[in-house]
Amino acid sequence: MEKGKTPAESYTEQVHLVNHADLNGYKRLFGGTLVSWIDIVAGIVARRHSGRNVTTVAIDSLEFIKPAYANDLIVLCGKLTYVGKTSMEVCITSYVEHLNGTRNTINKAYFVMVALDENERPTADRR
């Protein structure tokens, strides 16, 4: 029997530079853009863990802590926090990374992901 993957094996970081097209009317990063980036990271974490295509089934928590602005470097860090029979919980913490390398948290989210079989149905089978 093959040993399952550890959460560390599916850890994912993604980096975005905020540009003017990403801003809302208040010249801050549009929340919907950040949520889209978060969803992508959650999907990559779950896919790496399960070895399958995945889908988002729920957002358990999504907290906007601080704003981000044009030219900010956004770092999204995703890690697996729970694995059930068919679902996985992924925690994504988003930061603004400053030129000196320090990071300030701007968002924390928990997404529930499900691995899919060939018929796009939830499956407990891990590859």
Protein language model regions, located:
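Hot-dog-fold acyl-thioester-processing enzymes
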Residues: E2-A58, M113-R127
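Conserved interaction-surface patches within small, structured recognition/assembly domains
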Residues: V57-P67, V75-L80
